[in-house]
Amino acid sequence: MGRAELAGRRVLVVGLARSGMAAAHVLVGAGASVVGYDQNGSLEVGRLRELGVELHLGREEERLLQGIDLVVKSPGVPGETVLVQGARQRGIPVWSEIELGARLLSNPILGVTGTNGKTTTSELLGAVFRAAGRPVEVAGNVGRPLTSLVGSVADDAWIVCELSSFQLEDVETLEPKVGVLLNIEPDHLDRHGSFDAYAETKLRIFERQAADDTAVVPRGFGPIPGTARRVEFAGDDELPAEPLIPGPHNRENAAAATAAARAAGIGDDAIAEALRTFEGVPHRIELVRELRGVRYVNDSKGTNVAAALRALASFPDSRLHVILGGLGKNEAYEPLAAAFKAGDAGYVIGTTGEKIARALETAGVPVTRAETLDAAVAASAAAAEATDVVLLSPACASFDQFRDFEARGDAFRALVLELA
């Protein structure tokens, strides 16, 4: 079902945040009759109402499926919801917003997935394409919905598309010309149910690839689906230039981006220019300021244990004051506690703070139960000395106290900039 087939169809969009809003817009433009649903009864949907979208907010009712030909699901909507399960039981196709975009766009897609490093690698690849003078758009989980490019992207542009596991749940025809898997580590187990199910979803990026496509995977990674040409990368690869962004994990990201860019036909001179000048993205091991010799680093995007471990490893020669906690993802925190060096300290906040505190104390790490971010910043700033690092890398989601990880990182930045 492409653009022509959507005309006259009755399509239900489930979830009307950023991705759902973009999907509804493009569906209306394709001539579909659009029904929009979101459980948030106070959601601002005036723009959709002006487009003629039939809106239903609040209570989820299966009756909304009557007469529906297609369901488009936003990434934040779990598969076990009433409407999604009801659609499957009725044989109604369920697409992700990414699937809708992939069907409506003819541009070559460079897809990037993985547990950690997706946004940094996607934005770095955007910088590589621009350094080569090649038209490019960066979209997907990185911020701009893929469907928002329909009708606006240049015909010859590549699309670098960051793909989360949520976005890969309901894809059928997505075929990235180049697909990149950075890593797979435990995350979102509360959504997927098991690590195996999570990993299987990540690997869907390769399922539809053909022999003339390229799959970029970590060195030594196991079997993958699809028939694409396989290219491997590792953090010790020889690169066209050393990346400006610090940390061994970012060298891995740079190696993956280099392999992907070469697969897209970009030369090493442009890759080198981007590696030397790309400064990274906010909330990923971002230096906020240095005050009296203490560096304050915002890694609010460190929403799982694996990401926090990478952040800790970025400062091997500094005493760390690490702010941890938030809404956990059913992970064990003992491996994180074991990564603390002698002299490091933890400051725990949020719903999962106590669980993290117990793991740290068992490992002999000093812990301050701060509960809130402002208290944690105050306590860590008071304890830190010159050459120390105060690091926000929570190893948890933010939703218990903040709208999202960006809001948490912004709050940390504001608190740090207020320190005198």
Task: Label each PLM-derived region with a short phrase.
Residues 2-10, 20-30, 243-343, 358:
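Nucleotide phosphate-binding/pyrophosphate-handling subdomain across enzymes
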Residues 62-68, 75-216, 223-227, 400, ...:
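Phosphate-binding loop of NTP-binding sites
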